[in-house]
Amino acid sequence: FGIVEGLMTTVHSITATQKVPTPDVSVVDLTVRLVSWYDNEWGYSSR
């Protein structure tokens, strides 16, 4: 477990018993980044 850029992540290592037995199957690593932003227009309304 760890904190990376404010997100909680879980890291799993692949052991010898978890390896895929057939060479035609591969593991794909996908990285997803979620960016959210909220603007309540407080700066515009308080001008």
From Swiss-Prot:
SUPFAM superfamilies documented for this protein: Glyceraldehyde-3-phosphate dehydrogenase-like, C-terminal domain
Keyword Oxidoreductase annotated: yes
Keywords: Cytoplasm, Glycolysis, NAD, Oxidoreductase
Site note Activates thiol group during catalysis, residues: H12
EC number: 1.2.1.12
Pathway recorded for this protein: Carbohydrate degradation; glycolysis; pyruvate from D-glyceraldehyde 3-phosphate: step 1/5
Statement: the UniProt record of this protein carries the keyword NAD: yes
GO terms for MF: glyceraldehyde-3-phosphate dehydrogenase (NAD+) (phosphorylating) activity
PANTHER family xref list: GLYCERALDEHYDE 3-PHOSPHATE DEHYDROGENASE (PTHR10836), GLYCERALDEHYDE-3-PHOSPHATE DEHYDROGENASE GAPC1, CYTOSOLIC-RELATED (PTHR10836:SF112)
Protein name: Glyceraldehyde-3-phosphate dehydrogenase, cytosolic
Organism: Pseudotsuga menziesii
